[in-house]
UniProtKB/Swiss-Prot annotation:
GO cellular component: cytoplasm
Superkingdom to which the source organism belongs: Eukaryota
Gene name linked to the record: TFT10
Family in the record: Belongs to the 14-3-3 family.
Family matches, as InterPro entries: 14-3-3, 14-3-3_CS, 14-3-3_dom_sf, 14-3-3_domain
Biological process per Gene Ontology, one example term: protein localization
Protein's name in the database: 14-3-3 protein 10
PROSITE patterns in the record: 1433_1, 1433_2
Organism of this sequence: Solanum lycopersicum
Database matches in SUPFAM superfamilies: 14-3-3 protein (SSF48445)
Pfam families: 14-3-3
Subunit structure: Homodimer.
């Protein structure tokens, strides 16, 4: 369990301790240090690119392990249901509820920071897209496990956040920019996994990939690795999604 952190830490100390926690793979504490840094620095000031990336890494690791846990528990729940083992099903459902509460808390934490501090503090197109994309990501993580009206609301909030990010990205960031590419990647995943709209997912991923390929020679050395990695992920998803569609055609 992450410990309470000292009250009187400076911005530099928070940054150093967040990096230390990252090295030690203590991501819950990394989140605490970055939360404190954000609350002390924004919305009056803006995070540096390094701080912004550390915040993203901290939350991504915490939410990543919870999402993985949720998928495993849900899969076990289905197996127990197929075995008609009522006692086990009851225990697994309760445990899944516990994981879902933690997921909700983590998402609520970062979404509050984004809404109150980070989006209002953003002055550049790059940082605006970064934070709006992040907002979309965490609403999407809620949509992965919520049901009924809560799922509908989370999906709506995801769509609004990604669309707001996309409007700025398409106007102000080049097609090869890693943040614009990352947005296209995650937005297309949202269409595929949450909205079950494989056509829209494929067309969005394909367009982003092709536009980036056309301008590949303009890529600076500093973002070449990031951009080409995301382009590879876009292509992997396209291959997977189109083969899925083909499988369904073969079956029907």
């Amino acid at each position: 369990m992450a410990a309470l952190i000292p009250e009187n830490l400076s911005r530099e100390q928070c940054l150093y301790l967040a990096k230390l926690a990252e090295q030690a793979e203590r991501y819950e504490e990394m989140v605490q240090f970055m939360d404190k840094l954000v609350l002390n620095s924004t919305p009056a000031g803006e995070l540096t690119v390094e701080e912004r990336n550390l915040l993203s890494v901290a939350y991504k690791n915490v939410i990543g392990s919870l999402r993985a846990a949720w998928r495993i528990v849900s899969s076990i729940e289905q197996k127990e249901e197929s075995r008609k083992n009522e006692e086990h099903v009851h225990l697994v459902k309760e445990y899944r509820g516990k994981v879902e509460n933690e997921l909700s808390q983590v998402c609520a934490g970062i979404l509050k920071l984004l809404e109150s501090n980070l989006v209002p503090s953003a002055t550049t197109s790059e940082s605006k897209v970064f934070y709006l994309k992040m907002k979309g990501d965490y609403y999407r993580y809620l949509a992965e496990f919520k049901i009924g009206d809560e799922r509908k609301q989370a999906a709506e909030d995801t769509m609004n956040s990604y669309k707001a990010a996309q409007e700025i990205a398409l106007t102000d960031l080049p097609p090869t920019h890693p943040i614009r590419l990352g947005l296209a990647l995650n937005f297309s995943v949202f269409y595929f996994e949450i909205l079950n709209s494989s056509d829209k997912a494929c067309s969005m991923a394909k367009q982003a990939f092709e536009e980036a390929i056309a301008e590949l020679d303009t890529l600076g050395e500093e973002s070449y690795k990031d951009s080409t990695l995301i382009m590879q992920l876009l292509r992997d998803n396209l291959t997977l999604w189109t083969s899925d569609a083909q499988d369904q055609l073969d079956e029907s």
